């Protein structure tokens, strides 16, 4: 079980949003690279990064900040937000990114995801962001009619490294993970699932360490880490003991 600390980038700064609303951004660190190094020093082994501006623009906007992060940490980094073409994918992987996360393009052009998985095996994840049980795209600004499991099943056997499942209704508000929908997804597909959105407390961490959660590859934490609701050392200890 991997605990991924999150760095969400808006205008070059490390922020957290409430319910995916760009107008409800709290700045936590003006130096994302320093934050990345701090997470590494705390013992985390991965880093989850999202280019929020890029998610709306359809191309990387916070590239300078991402490059600084890659130079600041030795940890593997996965990046989502604005990655829509094979050229985008190749560009970031060539710069040292371990894994790209494809969200909107997974809905708009599933064939591109399949092609990317063949070209870059083990380095392509799919981000499924849901609101009210339906998949959202374009930086969560648009809702589709596609169900979460319906979309996920399109990529069975394609070589997708992981599915990062975000419940938008719980993101950034410390409401707790949507356990039912997350586990339903994990049970419906063979692709590893990473939970995102709502992780709120050490109680959630302890639940992640239970046998029923072994279907999950990990979980992403943002605001709970920044606000001190989750102690990094204790959380990592609990999850490693359950491995």
Swiss-Prot record:
The active site is at residues 8, 129. InterPro entries: Aldolase_TIM (IPR013785), His_biosynth (IPR006062), HisA_bact_arch (IPR006063), Isoase_HisA-like (IPR044524), Isoase_HisA-like_bact (IPR023016), RibuloseP-bd_barrel (IPR011060). Pathway: Amino-acid biosynthesis; L-histidine biosynthesis; L-histidine from 5-phospho-alpha-D-ribose 1-diphosphate: step 4/9. It catalyses: 1-(5-phospho-beta-D-ribosyl)-5-[(5-phospho-beta-D-ribosylamino)methylideneamino]imidazole-4-carboxamide = 5-[(5-phospho-1-deoxy-D-ribulos-1-ylimino)methylamino]-1-(5-phospho-beta-D-ribosyl)imidazole-4-carboxamide. It comes from the Bacteria. The keyword Isomerase applies. GO terms for biological process: L-histidine biosynthetic process; L-tryptophan biosynthetic process. It is an enzyme of class 5 (isomerase). Keywords: Amino-acid biosynthesis, Cytoplasm, Histidine biosynthesis, Isomerase. CDD domains: HisA. Its EC number is 5.3.1.16. GO terms for cellular component: cytoplasm. Its main location: cytoplasm. Gene3D superfamilies: Aldolase class I. The keyword Isomerase applies. GO terms for molecular function: 1-(5-phosphoribosyl)-5-[(5-phosphoribosylamino)methylideneamino]imidazole-4-carboxamide isomerase activity. It is found in: Cytoplasm. Coiled coil: none annotated. HAMAP family: HisA. Belongs to the HisA/HisF family. NCBIfam families: 1-(5-phosphoribosyl)-5-[(5-phosphoribosylamino)methylideneamino]imidazole-4-carboxamide isomerase (TIGR00007). This is 1-(5-phosphoribosyl)-5-[(5-phosphoribosylamino)methylideneamino] imidazole-4-carboxamide isomerase. It comes from Brucella canis (strain ATCC 23365 / NCTC 10854 / RM-666).
